């Protein structure tokens, strides 16, 4: 019965639409008919029947909307009401019926009409509820027309990317009285969903990605609900890009300058050259004028998004090892270490300045320091293995066993991958993840040296001591033959978040858990001594003691060399015996003067957090 009534209503409506000039009575009939169709379209069977029998009617209706709007604008209230209801009717027809989606989105004249309406809406016209409703309905029609339909997604994307999308965001980003930006972001999300090509299109357009990330407001107290809606869709867009291995491209696209690591390489070279007998004036000038840093606020926002997805979404696995519950791959991990190292080197290039000048200046900006903090937080989470990652690591890679030395003349296969940190995109051998567990690869890439270098810098409860510590640096060779230059950053990141040093120690604790190679390198780079120095209560950083105890316990597990080092530090008065007991360790001296090292009962805690 409903199908018959639908057919009769459409027939009646077509008679009115076919008249070149309509009178008031015709307009009333049209409104009645389209309202009935709108109500009927809420049922799937009706939507399906219309797609099978009334294709031509849909095209006639769309053409009428274009013609009447162009001729009358908003002056005819009845036609305006008819058009609004027609748009809502078309919107409903698209729900779960791909045939209707194809008919509507394939009508290029109608799609261009919608886009022009959204872009050219006169902001000088008094805002009315009707105007808001019709613009919102147009957006909803576009979204319903592309949901789960790759064909219509491609058609619409070709019409709106990139210029129209940029115009739409720029139009409303500073004055969105209609609250349309969240719907705009929803449209972008549905366009790129399940299409890596369209995701790449989005990421490659620098202006577009900047506009999207800029919509994340640091202070959303003015309109919390509106900003929350924007953030929700930006979060979903970003997550889709991360899952499809586009974090690196997105991060580079957000850069203020042409992205390259050559800047870091050249500053390192100039620093080396300054040790010669030639004048260092030019080197000094180049470093002191580098005040703009490397990172910007949009990149920091992106890192914050990645950190929240990994931490709050519990996406700590790495794709090459376990794809389930993963958001990034090994290449992204390496890229983030390269970014950390480049920021270190950028600031380290100032070593030829006077100590007093180093204390008062920096080559890094505030966003650089914020980026450092988020990189460290991310590594603190991904080095904390999930149960699946831990089981895989111990059963396949066995990092808890004493590493065997490479045969003489045989190069470490990972060094073959990592020996040129300035190679384009730090190309990664896919087989690396089949030879070593994640935490071993991160150590070989230099993460241990970076963390210990930071702890040797000017952070922590003793940051107000002699300024000589602020210029301290260390150049060490890892157990894998790589030379890593590291230096503590000049700026005290703990002024923003006292958890920075905790995250560094947490990383070292995670890396050393049941991993003999990592345990040894931390000892060789002086990490044990500095971690022991934090095994005491710090009123300015109350949880650092617990994390330091956690790290020392993991460092000493099945590692006699590390245990012996702590014994020797106890004799020198460096280690606190009470703190060692918290670790389940006790150091004493026998009657003949030899050191006695034994285990004592300790509280059970999780080994890897």
From Swiss-Prot:
Residues 266-292, 466-479 have a biased composition (Low complexity). GO terms for cellular component: cytoplasm; cytosol. Residues 265-293, 405-426, 461-490 are annotated as: Disordered. The keyword Cell cycle applies. Belongs to the ATXN10 family. May play a role in the regulation of cytokinesis. This is Ataxin-10 homolog. The lineage of its organism: Eukaryota, Amoebozoa, Evosea, Eumycetozoa, Dictyostelia.
